[in-house]
Amino acid sequence: MLSKAIRLESARSGICKCVTFGCSKPWKEIQAGHFVGGRTNGILFDERGIFPQCYACNVCRQGMGPEYTVFMLENYGQGLVDELIQKRRQAVKFTATELKEMIEGYKLRIKEAGGTL
């Protein structure tokens, strides 16, 4: 649901732009790429490092790390880049209540962005 919320909120007239390659595609054909890979809980839900990426960049080109880093530095600065890289090593345990609240928040955002569940 987080992926859908990010893609819908990033879309302009239903189109998202890949942050690493620059191509534009319908939001349903775009993925939510993580700046820091590894899918650890410390960064998995940190939206400051999740942006639209095309399938080719996110999967076929393993996230386009150097290009993603340039995007992050230009738009958010070295401080956030360093923080997200450091968070990769941190374990975060969410309670069932926290996860339910996150899901409800994502559902609301999807609805507000004009999407359906």
Language model region names:
Residues 1-17, 92-96:
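Short, charged surface segments at domain edges that flank catalytic/cofactor-binding sites
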Residues 14, 65, 114-117:
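Long, hydrophobic, amphipathic alpha-helical segments used as structural scaffolds
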